[in-house]
Amino acid sequence: MIWNESIECMDRESLRKIQSIRLKKTVERVYHDTPFYRKKMQELGITPDDINSIDDIVKLPFTTKYDLRDNYPFGLCAVPMSQIVRIHASSGTTGKPTVVGYTRKDLSAWSECLSRAFTAYGAGSSDIFQVSYGYGLFTGGLGAHAGAENIGASVIPMSSGNTEKQITLMHDFGSTVLCCTPSYALYLADAIRDSGLPREEFKLKVGAFGAEPWTESMRRDIETKLGIKAFDIYGLSEIAGPGVGYECECQHGTHLNEDHYFPEIVDPKTLEPVAPGQTGELVFTHLTKEGMPLLRYRTKDLTALHYDKCSCGRTLVRMDRILGRSDDMLIIRGVNVFPTQIESVILEMPEFEPHYLLLVDRKNNTDTMELQVEVRPEYYSDEINKMLALKKKLVARLQSVLGLGVDVRLVEPRSIERSVGKAKRVIDNRKL
């Protein structure tokens, strides 16, 4: 199903014309209404007159998370505060939060994008959405809620946590669509199994999962345990939260709503554009945002873009699954390691639960990496030989994929702390 066929299936030439018109308007707005961007453009020797098509976007300055924090809280807003009707913020690990302001038009556009996503998942007005993303400053809960209401669905505003009640209402209310992080979906699946309630009494059919990286192996695990079709929903709070991109029924990549958020892929070191299909850092420019439009925002997400028409009929660009983040990449003894690589190995082996912890340290001037991973109950044994054989199998597979050795410690089921939000998978104790 397609929510807005006129946009989602528009020919590329017509789409580029729309993007060019919207980019020029956005640049004019930020140049006149946002001192930060006016100064940035003046330093580069450009004015809005230099931006006449979407191809001219490469002339514009980049924006980073540090720019948002340096202009905290409302320094990048392009409208008076009287027009800002909602404020969201992401809680970074350190320092002040990243603040984003929305006008009524911004919220409407965001809801439109989420409606496209949920429709692509096969959801509609007859569905009951259980929104288990956090409500509040985090964009997930309120964003998914508005998108579900926009397609006419019923919404249970559960928010995150309180797992026992989540299961009760999911069972009693007949929830058909679950919105949460993929790690919490797995946690819910285990909790449902332990509750003793028969899975066939649940009516879940679709999951919209995002807010953290996940793998195809994790998707299969979720689908098997919950008996649903699991879809990726992409977003980031600086741009619009969930709904920036979405999968269709083909699941051959994530369609980006590029009539609102124009994507580029650049080399993270040189910041030069890369060819279509090549991996690099994802960059977004707002084309319709009123409250706080951003130019060439560096997401730090590593991926690639594909512009050929999807077999679903959509022409919107497709993005590969996020490989990782350029700022999350671990360099271990000169080797680039992404946590998603390790997760893929764990999830392809039936002996292990999808719960792990990666501990990185530096001892005697040498990087060390210890992986703690839970063994499934049916494979866990008190027999040392069996555990050693299982450990050896995992070590060999990791060596093959990563190209370096990993110290592995097999732990008992349910011994690694669970999270109802984004899972904390990596602890890097090195003094870099």
Residue ranges and their predicted role:
Residues A123-D127:
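Short helix-loop-beta connector
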Residues Y184-K203, R220-T224:
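Adenylate-forming
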Residues R104-A117, I128-Y187:
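AMP-binding/adenylate-forming
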Residues K205, W214-K309:
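Conserved AMP-binding/adenylate-forming
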Residues M1-A89, T94-E112, R116-A120, N365-V373, ...:
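Nucleotide 5′-phosphate-binding alpha/beta core
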Residues L178, T288-L402, G421:
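AMP-binding/adenylate-forming catalytic core of the ANL superfamily
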Residues V30, S90-T93, F129, L178, ...:
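Conserved S/T- and glycine-rich ATP-binding loop of Class I adenylate-forming
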Residues I128, S195-W214:
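Conserved helix-loop-beta element of the AMP-binding
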